[in-house]
Amino acid sequence: WFYQPYNIHAPAVMFDRTNHIDNYPDYFADSVAITSVKSTLLTDIYQEELNTPAYVSLEMKVDMDAATRQLSIDISGEKVLPIADEDSVRINVWLTEDSLYTEEQRGVSGGYYHRHSLRRCLTSTWGDKIDVSQPFSLHLTTELPANWREERMNAVAFVACRDAEDKNSCRVLNACQERVAMMPL
């Protein structure tokens, strides 16, 4: 959905689901929020996003019961800056895993280790609607399959706007991540 139908490429990058065409028209010429990782301006775009304030606070606590592989996630936050369309705000919670090895990866010869690979979406695809007119909280639980390496996993939460008609109106308002389990010594 974020790509143009004729231009799907990897590797690619997206910063906060934001189209930077006003400042970087040559790199966002398709009016989408995605550009190639070969862009020479990635550092500039990254710095611009680092300077963008968070519109909501976001805190997350992750607990895992190693015996049952049951994961418990508690998230809380509140609006800290005005948001144009508060009715469109949603929270997304994902589980990711690092160091997933594959021998086949287009554009790479030999093996390749994937980082931040999406393992499970704990909310609906486009996030669960939240009311940011007051402090919000969310409690989620899930069981990790035995073949997932919890020491390589993160819980990622982000709050974003959602506009089903305009892909450039889905800005991320804040994000956080926590490790699922500590690496063994």
Named regions from a protein language model:
Residues 1-185:
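Short, conserved sequence motifs used for protein processing/export or organelle targeting and
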